[in-house]
């Protein structure tokens, strides 16, 4: 019996070590013991859920050795006041499904790392997509600078690596434009805004999709990518792997939204109609960086506060 218990412990340690190597995680000896224990706790939760759940979880992703409380501290796109903005009804019949990835209009998955900069990744992913759709270009090489927005949008109401809103990013781009990644590389840290960087793209405005209106969000997605915000605080979201995600504990009211992402389409997954949502946590999280979120019931608030840039242009 003792030998069997030892074998279980070794197997678990190997699993943890493999995860740490894959995710480039390094810990002190004492911290490693704690992280392994959390990893094993999460692995047990994943195994239990996957036996009964309608979608799949995994401990492959970057947050497998974090408690849910620790993970939630990373979610920085929080709202303290109601936002106003131009709301537009498209009033068009959207197609049954849309997936801009299949059209080559979605740039590769990015990784925001430990910086609370999701608001820059969600908003710029939508801008990149709409530039590709409306003005052309190569999805594999188009890369706008999130660092530019992290460092330079404080006067617009954002807070660097401690969170912000995509609408503030768009306000900045309307006036100043946004640089290329190669001219203003991502460091995932706060620093002073560089004012001598050449802008590569600009917008003339942005539009808010009518709140909680799934038909209008589909219509907006039929024309291009949309910046959306969600409640990502659940352990199930933290450890999501694949399938049609839904969670009754997840909130969809405006002030519960805490993570900004980008919707790239919608379609049927495992028999359920879902939004196709692009995250900014690298390809190791979720379904190669994506999550399929059930449309019915406005899961986690996808349709609560969507917006997209207008008048997109290269400079």
UniProtKB/Swiss-Prot annotation:
Biological process annotations from GO: immune response; positive regulation of apoptotic signaling pathway; proteolysis involved in protein catabolic process
UniProt-annotated catalytic positions: 118, 259, 279
Signal peptide: 1-13
InterPro entries documented for this protein: Papain-like_cys_pep_sf, Pept_asp_AS, Pept_cys_AS, Pept_his_AS, Peptidase_C1A, Peptidase_C1A_C, Peptidase_C1A_papain-like, Prot_inhib_I29
Listed GO MF terms: cysteine-type endopeptidase activity
Assembly and binders: Interacts with cysteine protease inhibitor ICP1. Interacts with cysteine protease inhibitor ICP2.
Protein name: Cysteine proteinase 2
Native source organism of the sequence: Entamoeba histolytica (strain ATCC 30459 / HM-1:IMSS / ABRM)
Gene: CP2
